[in-house]
């Protein structure tokens, strides 16, 4: 089982959860705003992602995370489930948040983009759903986080672990601060809690 795309996709016993799949009408509206302002929109399915266009902002976003560039498919959301959107913008946050903030949650996790999921979804909600589906109420919970999208999750779990490269707010919520993600921080954190030898 796993949770991905900020809690929007939960896979358990080969089935996906009832979370996710941003409404196509909202994806279309966001795509229109991005096109009008020189921004871009990326659509995330399970292991696949596509972009509405390719421009310098898209290049900068994916270069920041050393991630392959998405293929361009402006209408991908019409024929595939989309669990997370990435609004690729530097200065236009309010143009997206104001009209759609009651339906979508926006997390700015890089200088170039905002992770975008359905309102009410989060990694925290995903953890709660998976625990309930698996009948594991009461088990100790651990989570690693570094960005704004991780804050609700870090507040929820029993043992919050912040990455060394994380934002101050994540570190403030952490029981333990591990090394950076590029310095085996996950392994170090698991070893600290005796979850790995």
Labelled PLM ranges:
Residues 1-14, 20-24:
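Alpha-helical substrate-recognition element adjacent to the catalytic core
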Residues 1-5, 61-62, 106-109, 160-164, ...:
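Short hydrophobic/aromatic-enriched beta-strand-loop microsegments
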Residues 7, 89-93, 164-168:
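Short, polar loop motifs at secondary-structure junctions
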Residues 13-16, 90-92:
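Short loop segments at secondary-structure junctions
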Residues 20-21, 70-72, 177-180:
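Short acidic-hydrophobic, aromatic-tinged amphipathic segments that line or gate anion-handling sites
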Residues 28-32, 36-144, 148-153:
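Conserved acidic, metal-coordinating active-site core of Asp-based
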Residues 116-197:
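Mg2+-dependent phosphoryl-transfer enzymes with acidic/Ser/Thr/Gly-rich catalytic loops
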